[in-house]
Amino acid sequence: MESTLRSGAGQPGLKLIETLRLGSSPARLALHRARMAAGAAALGWGFDAAGFDRAIQVDPQAGLRLRLTLDAAGRFEVTQGAVPDSGPQWRLSLAEARLSSTDPWLRVKTTNRATYDMARAALPAGIDEILFQNERGEVCDGSITTLFFDRGAGMHTPPLSAGLLPGVLRAELACPEETLLVADLPHVRLWVGNALRGLIPAVWRG
């Protein structure tokens, strides 16, 4: 996996991304830091943990949504904005594009995310989030969220082996992994979420 990532680590404009909410717990901030550090290691980039901590010391009055990027030269860049209103429930549908469970780029959060961005830009009317499946019909990620589900035995989440990002909220909740097929989506209780928005109840619209 790392050899594939490192061979593409020099593509122009590539950056690692962490999007976090100011005021998050130290434990959650540590998860963001650890994920960016792991991504940098996979790409063969340097990572300055103290620089990460300095970069997120910003004025919350400029917005609680903080997007931190890291480039190949080790430079951090911060942008701030308002946290989007998520609403009480999200309506879910399925993307036409499929992901490959063996694609190593799905495991690191970078600006190399055109498949996700295009799907989100083309959300159908009445849909809040689009889900992806892999080549086996297993549910992976949403375009900006992790999926969580309950068949009646407690909350679970799809396994990393399906081809998805190790989300910070996912790590924080530490739900058991379980494979979920697209055919199962109408029959389970659903949530989506990320570290910025938290956990959002969801409903399958097909």
Task: Kindly label every feature range from the protein language model.
Residues 1-138, 152, 160-206:
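Conserved alpha/beta cores of soluble small-molecule-handling proteins
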Residues 141, 146-157:
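Glycine- and Gly-Pro-enriched alpha-helical subdomains that act as flexible
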